[in-house]
């Protein structure tokens, strides 16, 4: 998931992501771990960009999460931060 936020919400949003959102996503049981990163380059004057990579063992588990859990967890972000962020998903596969 790639997320771009307005700088004014950075502290509150980071706290929410680390203490609430990411733990809630992991607590669904569909993902094994998460890696939370900040984009350093290219620098964007309009906002701050972050990424969370959630790892799961099967595509089926990912699809179940999207269908059963994602809408309500995503809504919590909109309820709290409104239009001060944008987020989009990318589905990737690890190549060993």
Regions found by a protein language model. Name each.
Residues 1-4, 36-68:
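Short, well-ordered beta-strand segments in beta-rich or mixed alpha/beta enzyme
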Residues 5, 29, 61, 76-83:
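A generic structural signal for ordered secondary structure
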Residues 7-9, 58-60, 95:
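Residues that cap or initiate secondary-structure elements
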Residues 9-36, 74-75:
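Short amphipathic alpha-helical segments
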Residues 19-23, 53-56, 71-75, 84:
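Short, low-complexity, polar/charged sequence segments that are solvent-exposed and flexible
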Residues 28, 68-69:
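Structured segments of extracytoplasmic/periplasmic soluble domains
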Residues 35-48, 75-96:
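Glycine-rich beta-strand-turn "strand-cap" elements at beta-sheet edges
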């Amino acid at each position: 998931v790639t997320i771009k936020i307005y700088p004014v919400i950075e502290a509150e949003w980071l706290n929410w992501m680390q203490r609430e959102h990411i733990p809630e996503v992991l607590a669904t049981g569909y993902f094994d771990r998460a890696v939370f990163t900040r984009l350093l380059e290219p620098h964007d004057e309009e906002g701050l960009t972050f990424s969370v990579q959630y790892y799961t063992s099967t595509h089926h588990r990912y699809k179940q999460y999207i269908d059963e859990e994602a809408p309500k967890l995503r809504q919590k972000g909109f309820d709290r931060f409104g239009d001060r962020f944008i987020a989009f998903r990318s589905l990737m596969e690890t190549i060993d």
